[in-house]
């Protein structure tokens, strides 16, 4: 009698763990406004603050093992450099390279004591911005007033949603998932601007709220707006030197900035 011996080979699959190190980027846009159709858009122009901002984030990136990139050439070329940041949604290759991208205005200062924002906010599902107390504490009845709802762009957004989500757009973190979720709304930037005559910050708030993307409120100290008034400078992680005073040579914060960042070359010319 023939006997058949069946040999069964057992393959043990051991999952390979890829040690993926998260790559995080800090990005700023500082482009010659004269390359755009509206160089005086929103009264924004070149100023000395950008050198301190750039230098502070270069040091911050080195300290925390991050990457820093400063964009100096137009891509979208729409109205003014402030609209260039929407390329972070429109160009998908950004997230072939990075897990998270933080946009910062060129008048935001990374304070020397600031911790690693990406370590504290590692969720890859959400769009993140600093809690802005002015909007969080605004009565619901005031959310849709003209000064916060220019030309009715937020008419379809509930007052509660506005109070929970609305943010100041000088600092935010974008991830691949949040960018993909928001993309159909971001693509409309020219049409929405044409319809409502809104600024880029209002448009971004609209895109976040209208899209329903997962939103994460970061601590308010990641974007502390300051026009030179006296505050406890040990509290802010990122100091946002907003407003027109920074265009004046006597702006009170320049003395402090020189102490915090003594290696900034004051002779470095500001582009016009």
Predicted features and spans:
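Catalytic core and acceptor-binding pocket of nucleotide-sugar-dependent glycosyltransferases
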Residues: 162-254
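Long, low-complexity C-terminal extensions of enzymes
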Residues: 258-272
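A conserved donor-nucleotide-binding helix/loop in the catalytic core
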Residues: 76-104, 110-119, 127, 167, ...
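N-terminal anchoring/stem segment of glycosyltransferases
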Residues: 19-98, 211, 242-246, 264-268
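Conserved donor-nucleotide/metal-binding helix-loop-beta segment in metal-dependent transferases, i.e.
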Residues: 112-149
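Short, flexible, basic/aromatic active-site loop/helix in glycosyltransferases
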Residues: 148-163
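Short, positively charged and aromatic/hydrophobic N-terminal segments
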Residues: 4-18
């Amino acid at each position: 009698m023939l006997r058949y011996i069946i040999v069964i080979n057992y393959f043990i699959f051991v999952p390979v763990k890829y040690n993926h190190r998260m790559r995080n980027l800090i990005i700023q846009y500082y482009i010659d406004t004269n390359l755009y159709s509206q160089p005086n858009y929103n009264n924004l122009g070149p100023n000395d603050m950008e050198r301190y901002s750039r230098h502070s984030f270069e040091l911050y990136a080195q300290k925390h093992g991050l990457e820093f990139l400063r964009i100096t050439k137009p891509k979208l070329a729409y109205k003014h450099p402030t609209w260039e940041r929407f390329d972070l949604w429109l160009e998908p290759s950004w997230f072939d390279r990075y897990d998270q991208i933080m946009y910062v205005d060129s008048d935001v200062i990374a304070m020397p004591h600031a911790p690693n924002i990406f370590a504290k906010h590692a969720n890859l599902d959400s769009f993140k911005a600093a809690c802005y107390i002015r909007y969080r504490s605004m009565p619901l009845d005031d959310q849709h007033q003209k000064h916060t709802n220019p030309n009715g762009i937020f008419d379809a957004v509930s007052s509660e949603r506005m109070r929970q989500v609305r943010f100041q757009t000088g600092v935010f973190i974008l991830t691949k998932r949040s960018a993909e979720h928001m993309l159909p709304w971001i693509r409309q930037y020219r049409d929405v601007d044409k319809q409502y005559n809104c600024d880029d910050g209002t448009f971004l708030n609209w895109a976040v709220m209208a899209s329903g993307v997962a939103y994460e409120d970061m601590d308010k100290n990641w974007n502390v707006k300051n026009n030179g008034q006296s505050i406890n400078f040990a509290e802010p992680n990122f100091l946002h030197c907003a407003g027109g005073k920074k265009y004046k040579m006597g702006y009170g914060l320049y003395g402090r900035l020189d102490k915090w960042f003594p290696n900034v070359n004051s002779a470095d010319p500001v582009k016009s």
